[in-house]
Curated annotation (Swiss-Prot):
Binds 4 Cu cations per monomer. Glycans are attached at residues 143, 286, 456. Cu cation 1 binds at residues 148, 511. This is Laccase ARB_05828. It comes from the Eukaryota. One of its GO terms (molecular function) is hydroquinone:oxygen oxidoreductase activity. It is found in: Secreted. SUPFAM superfamilies: Cupredoxins. It is an enzyme of class 1 (oxidoreductase).
Length: 633
């Protein structure tokens, strides 16, 4: 994973690999460059990663006192000679190495429960597989933070889902939190802050979990992150959403590069070189604030082999609409040598979908955000044209998204008629924000029916499981009376919205935490419970889908993961304005998971730290104002 220059927060990662399967030691003289092990774990069976800085000749590891890290001992000192706890890492960061971790999938004999199992499939010859841990250190001044690992199921592990006010209190400035989870899925996704509008300011990055694909390829290309960008902080622009006039984005970015002035300067474009006749895996990730993109490469077609974290039967297309939070794995087949000689340069396009974007006047019109060259990057601009295809804001056709692993969903039958009569309606309204004087002007809000979401950072629901009821602004939907062989069915409608109005996108990207859901029906027509036509035999499966404004979706999931799972619109302005709810799944089982659980204990300690920080108003950006001005998520 390459650093794309998108993060506004220092994220340090430490991966714990049980012996004997840790990264191998490198046979390099210790005085050549800094190379050392961090302080060992208290668990003697765990070995931490080795820290390596091969480009930092003349530096050495320094541990004379607490807080030391690196010290320059060479003969040509530069601007800085030490990296320690007092170093401003907004300005100075030691240059380490790019790390890649590989998992081997093998057949093994494993004794899990006292009986030998001869047909086990395991990672790195061990069961369970290697344990991944990520430590996040908050060095912001006026904000807490929490990091969400988008699409990771967090099976029986709600504590690490990273949603402040739901799964944890925010990490206060000066504190750290280690997220622990098992990667049981594979594909590509992203991690991002779920604290208010932080990710809109750049707090996100890509992640890939390697695994099989449903079609072959020769090489993989780095993750392609397509996003929209504001030149001012989203926190400063948010008032426009409250006033009914959503902020306009300034430019389109692909992998950290954009051309705001739309000059066509190739230095401002993403560029890569391909070989004719080779097949390349592209990992497409939409990390936008408010834009659905249509991805294409002039003159090329590709096979789609995965949607979100779900491998699918391959199909061929020349373009693909990618909603916010959605991901696709596609395989691009390079042109033949003869074709490549005729024209060795092609535009990569991330085109804003019709009705699902808003840019400042004259901005966001140049969708040529990248170039692929054949054999050599000669620095010359392509002259290719965009293909003749639809730029509508809609999901890929459901009949094309066929999961490789087939699921058959039970027919909800007559028992669900009552539930189908009470769908969750996406509504646009006005309200007085909690904690604000009633004399304040009404502001715009979004909601899934009963109330806009407005969480309490100091009282996440995980701390309040003994309560029988919750504040209406927490928007809690209980899912208690289910067992593993039953399903939860949800109908979400946008029937009260008017598409293409000043504040309504043509489609809302709806994301569910903690689960893959099946998409049983999706329509641009108004919801009518008497005309239900569900696809129950191997329906599309993912965790983000587009809800058409004026239409509806019917989704379902297995209630096999106790937790309180956020369901929200991934248009950042809409989530901040309240368009979210939480599904409280199997509350009693969730309570049992909190017993003797170090993650639950850490959550409580982190909340105490948060409360101490939050109680001092001098820590606020505006000490005399309101600390919270949006939903919190």
């Amino acid at each position: 994973m390459k650093r794309l220059g998108l993060a506004a927060l220092y994220i340090g990662s430490a991966l714990a690999w049980p012996e004997p399967h840790g990264p191998p030691s490198r046979n390099v003289p210790r005085d050549d460059f800094p190379m050392f092990n961090p302080l060992p774990s208290t668990d003697l069976n765990t070995r931490l990663i080795r820290c390596e800085y091969p480009s930092m000749k003349g530096w050495t590891y320094s541990n004379k006192k607490n807080g030391d890290w690196l010290k320059y001992v060479g003969s040509k000192p530069g601007e800085i000679t030490e990296y320690n706890i007092d170093t401003d890492n907004d300005k100075y960061v030691p240059q380490g190495i790019t790390r890649k971790y590989h998992l081997e999938v093998t057949d093994e004999s494993v004794n899990m429960d006292g009986t030998m199992f001869d047909q086990a499939k395991v990672f790195n010859k061990q069961y369970p597989g290697p344990w991944i841990q990520i430590t996040v250190t908050n060095k912001l001044k006026h904000n807490g933070t929490a990091i969400h690992w988008h699409g990771i199921r967090m099976m029986e592990n709600m504590f690490n889902d990273g949603v402040p006010g739901v799964t944890q209190c925010p990490i206060p400035p000066g504190s750290s939190m280690t997220y622990r989870f098992k990667a049981s899925q594979y594909g590509s996704s992203w991690y991002h802050s779920h604290y208010s509008l932080q990710y809109a300011d750049g707090l996100f990055g890509p992640m890939t979990i390697h695994g099989p694909t449903s079609a072959g390829y020769d090489k993989a290309v780095d993750p392609l992150l397509m996003t929209d960008h504001l030149h001012s902080s989203a926190f400063e622009e948010y008032h426009k959403e409250l006033e009914g006039k959503p902020p306009a984005m300034d430019s389109i970015i692909l992998n950290g590069k954009g051309d705001y002035d739309q000059t066509g300067d190739l230095k401002k474009k993403y560029r890569t070189v391909l070989k004719p006749g080779k097949k390349y895996l592209l990992r497409l990730i939409n990390t936008s604030v408010a834009t659905t993109f249509v991805f294409s490469i002039d003159g090329h077609k590709f096979q789609v082999v995965g949607s979100d974290f779900v491998p699918i039967e391959p199909y061929v297309t020349d373009h693909i609409a990618v909603g916010i939070g959605q991901r696709y794995h596609v395989i691009l087949e390079g042109l033949s040598e003869e074709e490549a000689k005729k024209n060795g340069r092609y535009w990569v396009r991330t085109t804003p979908a019709k009705g699902c974007s808003k840019f400042a006047p004259g901005r966001g019109t140049d969708d040529r955000t990248g170039v692929i060259y054949y054999n050599k990057d000669d620095g010359v601009s392509p002259t290719t044209e965009i293909g003749a295809f639809s730029l509508d804001c809609r999901d890929e056709p459901l009949e094309k998204l066929v999961p490789k692993v087939k699921w058959t969903v039970p027919d909800p039958g007559l028992n669900m008629v009552g539930a189908f009569e009470k769908p969750a309606d996406v509504q646009l309204g006005k309200w007085h924000r909690p904690g604000y004087p009633d004399t304040d002007n009404l502001v715009s809000n979004w909601e899934f029916g009963p109330s806009p979401m407005w969480i309490n950072y100091s009282e996440p629901i995980i701390k309040n499981l003994d309560k029988d009821s919750f504040p209406s602004t927490w928007v809690v939907y209980p899912a208690d009376d289910y067992v593993n062989d039953k399903w939860v069915y949800l109908v979400i409608t946008g029937k009260k919205l008017k598409p293409l109005s000043s504040q309504v996108a043509v489609a809302h990207p709806i994301h569910l935490h903690g689960h893959d859901f099946v998409l049983l029906q999706q329509s641009m027509e108004p919801w009518d419970s008497t005309e239900v036509n569900l696809k129950l035999d191997n329906p599309p499966r993912r965790e983000v889908t587009l809800l058409p404004a004026g239409g509806f979706i019917v989704i379902a999931f297995k209630p096999d993961n106790p937790g309180s799972w956020l369901l929200h619109c991934h248009i950042a302005w809409h989530a901040s304005a309240g368009l979210a709810l939480q599904v409280l799944e199997r509350k009693e089982d969730l309570k049992a998971l909190t017993l003797n659980n170090p993650d639950f204990d850490f959550m409580q300690e982190n909340c105490r730290k948060w409360d101490a920080w939050h109680s001092d108003k001098t820590n606020y950006w505006n000490p005399s104002g309101h600390f919270q001005d949006d939903s919190g998520v």
